[in-house]
Amino acid sequence: MPWAIWVDRDKCIGCYSCIVACKLEHNLPPYPVHPPLGNPQGPELIRVHRVGPHIRDEEIHQHFQPVLCVHCPDAPCIEACLCSAIYKDIETGITLVDQDECTGCKSCLEVCPYGAPQFYDGKLYLCDLCIHRLGQRGRERRYTACEAACPARAIHVGTTDEISAMMGKKAAERAGKEEKRIGQ
């Protein structure tokens, strides 16, 4: 069964714990000695963007939008990769990168609808859903570093069926709240 990730942006508080946990888990530098101009903080497999504040319905709104690889079933980055450095793990469906094969052409960046690919020192970095934590190739449930570190419990990793069920439940909750708000 393929694995997936979903971030409930209504719960994300923008604390950046996911970024710190991911960098520690993957031994990525927080700040390189000689930072390149375009990426002074080193590679980030997950980024968090602040959206807002803005006024809607006479209220101030702001939310945070984590950006990371969502491991698309038909990942366009795999098709676009000219050197076949991006591939799917057959058992888990996780999109992975062979950095030794990556030539840094950035063709994957052009086609990713999420802006997930990160380049640092000429190599591609993508979230790998902490595949090394999944136990025996996805059969044993363990938390990813970002999921375990999130104090708001906004990050969810599971099988595609589990994630679809969570997203469906969230959509139903939102629809109920909107219906209630309109009825007032």
Predicted regions and their residues:
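Non-ligating segments of multi-cofactor redox enzymes
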Residues: 1-184
